[in-house]
A protein has these predicted regions:
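C-terminal PAP-associated
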Residues: 1-112
Length: 112
């Protein structure tokens, strides 16, 4: 992934490919794009979308919502049954670490 597969584009080097396996899904993050796949079938469920879309609830001018600076980390907390996704924001101001946690094990639009 990261070489045009499933709509991922490689726009930086290295591609900073990162992923995690959850209860029913696999989350793949390649630099600035994130996608969700079915763990059982491998089918694309959502995305790829720009990683900063995960942080739009912070407001249109918040650096985490505006910047999509990459170096993502996708993790699944098996004990809590939640996804934890991070990326940094360093463009145009002080650095931020953008962190988003899911409300349950099923990653989909709106449940982060």
């Amino acid at each position: 992934m990261g070489n045009g597969d499933y709509g991922f584009t490689r726009n930086a080097a290295p591609p900073d490919t990162n992923g995690a396996v959850g209860a029913t899904q696999y989350v793949q993050w390649v630099n600035e794009s994130v996608a969700v796949f079915s763990k059982s079938t491998g089918a694309l469920i959502q995305g790829p979308v720009a990683g900063n879309q995960l942080f739009q609830a912070l407001g249109a001018t918040h650096p985490c919502a505006v910047n999509n600076d990459g170096d993502p980390i996708a993790q699944y907390d098996k004990q809590a049954g939640r996804w934890v996704l991070t990326q940094f924001s360093v463009t145009g101001g002080p650095p931020f670490l953008s962190v988003r946690c899911s409300v349950n094990h099923f990653r989909r639009q709106g449940n982060f």
